Amino acid sequence: MATVLAKIKIMPTSPEVNKEKLKEKIKEVLEKQDVAIRGLFDEPLAFGLYAIYTVIEMEEREGGTEPIENALAEIDEVESVETVEVSLA
């Protein structure tokens, strides 16, 4: 199987969500998903809103990133999760 890199966009529920605490929760979830975290950063959008992006490395698997997206979406402070890019490592 091939190794893939995936960039995932995570939107918090509001601008008041503590970014650093949310990043820690994201790391905890990803560590349980058998993936390597290659990047975790935030990007300001507008009016105090921001998106958090993570870049992960994983072995190609059935279902792709969907199980990871679902696990991240279960975090209380997360509004939405979307895989924005996937490529071979």
From Swiss-Prot:
Pfam families: EF1_GNE (PF00736). SMART domains: EF1_GNE. It comes from the Archaea. One of its GO terms (molecular function) is translation elongation factor activity. InterPro entries: eEF-1beta-like_sf, EF1B_bsu/dsu_GNE, Transl_elong_EF1B/ribsomal_bS6, Transl_elong_EF1B_B_arc. NCBIfam families: aEF-1_beta (TIGR00489), PRK00435.1 (NF001670). Belongs to the EF-1-beta/EF-1-delta family. Promotes the exchange of GDP for GTP in EF-1-alpha/GDP, thus allowing the regeneration of EF-1-alpha/GTP that could then be used to form the ternary complex EF-1-alpha/GTP/AAtRNA. This is Elongation factor 1-beta. It comes from Methanocaldococcus jannaschii (strain ATCC 43067 / DSM 2661 / JAL-1 / JCM 10045 / NBRC 100440) (Methanococcus jannaschii). The gene is ef1b.
